[in-house]
Amino acid sequence: MRAVFPGRFQPFHLGHLAVIEWLLSKYDELIIVVGSGKDSHTIYNPFTAGERILMIKKGLKEFNVDFTRVIFFPIMDSFTSGLWIRNLELYSPKFDVVVSGNPLVISDAREAGYIVDLPPMFNREMYNATKIRKLMLENNESWSELVPKSVYSFIKEIKGDERLRDIARNDY
């Protein structure tokens, strides 16, 4: 069976990694959909879709996850109920299962007739992208412990943490 796992991955962290490892233990193939594909350079979505795909690939490689069974692609958001899943069907290879904890995604997937699998939350209080971005904004390097080392290095290389702080600056 092929499962689809949508997320924003802003940034990709160890909780995401744990879910992906769990999914690959259950399913033959996994489609990772990078949501908010056109959004970047905001506090909520600081990284581009391409940067996020690279983060995921680097993190999976670091932990020796077989990503030959993984398909990656970005998708733009749709805020109309039912339209998001239809867009996903247009751009994605066929899939059998939608994996999400997002109530709107779950509702749309079920209404479209898909099996929904709720992923376990692997230490959600700790591994939380909003928390990680907040730590970056505060210039608190403890966020480095919440992401794979390769992702930390990549974010530093592209100055993603500096970008986030620059975006957050207000000159009035």
UniProtKB/Swiss-Prot annotation:
It is found in: Cytoplasm. Keywords: ATP-binding, Cytoplasm, NAD, Nucleotide-binding, Nucleotidyltransferase, Pyridine nucleotide biosynthesis, Transferase. One of its GO terms (biological process) is NAD biosynthetic process. It is an enzyme of class 2 (transferase). One of its GO terms (molecular function) is ATP binding. GO terms for cellular component: cytoplasm. It catalyses: beta-nicotinamide D-ribonucleotide + ATP + H(+) = diphosphate + NAD(+). Its main location: cytoplasm. Pathway: Cofactor biosynthesis; NAD(+) biosynthesis; NAD(+) from nicotinamide D-ribonucleotide: step 1/1. Pfam families: CTP_transf_like (PF01467). InterPro entries: Cyt_trans-like, NMN_Atrans_arc, Rossmann-like_a/b/a_fold. It comes from the Archaea. Its EC number is 2.7.7.1. PANTHER family: BIFUNCTIONAL NMN ADENYLYLTRANSFERASE_NUDIX HYDROLASE, PHOSPHOPANTETHEINE ADENYLYLTRANSFERASE. Belongs to the archaeal NMN adenylyltransferase family. This is Nicotinamide-nucleotide adenylyltransferase. It comes from Sulfurisphaera tokodaii (strain DSM 16993 / JCM 10545 / NBRC 100140 / 7).
